[in-house]
Amino acid sequence: IYVEKAVIMKILAIHNFHRKGSASGDDQVFKSETALLEEHGNQVIRYTVSNDEFDDAGVIGKLSATFGMLWSFKNYRNVRQLIEKEKPDIVHVHTFFPLLSPSILYAAKKSGVKVVATLHDTRFVCPCSTSLRGTELCNECGDGKYYRMCKYGCFKNSKLQSFIVASIFIYHRIRKSFYKQIDHY
């Protein structure tokens, strides 16, 4: 006799993969965790993007992706449509920076689905995600004053890129995106 296992929970798992070949703990955790959830009877729908998309983008594509870090209309729309179609019980967000953007959090909340997030790094207190300046521990942005990273060019050793990233995180801190749009960490 064959007895079909009931699905315990339907989970929409969202992740922004790093570039192929980069050693990324959060990429591995995402893969392992979603596989484990499925092994235990959950249905997992994956919505992922990869930073490899930057490599294939021309100048216009890279500019568009830069503005998309603040708010990705494409990913907001895609996540809303996926939630509408699949009707998950919960949305589990792993890494959303840079391509997915916090817009996906708003898409999930607007759809009425609970959002949980796994923090794989210190990105919410250090937009560079490492809490390091060179090899030294740094907590200058820990109080939410992300503009300090501009002084040191923390993001990719570039003051301009640091300014862009700091602006994005300041905007989302003002909107309380990481507090109001996520139900549990």
Predicted segments, located by residue:
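Short aromatic-enriched loop/helix-cap "lid" or pocket-rim segments at secondary-structure transitions
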Residues: 26, 55-60, 104, 127-132, ...
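A short, charged, and often flexible helix/loop element on the N-terminal side
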Residues: 49-81, 93, 154-167
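Membrane-proximal helix-turn-helix segments that form the acceptor-binding/catalytic region
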Residues: 110, 123, 136-184
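N-terminal subdomain of nucleotide-sugar transferases
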Residues: 3-50, 84-86, 104-117
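Glycine/Thr-rich phosphate-binding loops of Rossmann-like dinucleotide-binding domains
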Residues: 21-22, 101, 125-126
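Short, compositionally biased "basic patch" segments
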Residues: 38-55, 134-147
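Structural motif corresponding to alpha-helix initiation and N-cap regions
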Residues: 73-80, 99-102, 172
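Short N-terminal targeting/anchoring amphipathic segment
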Residues: 81-100, 113-120, 184
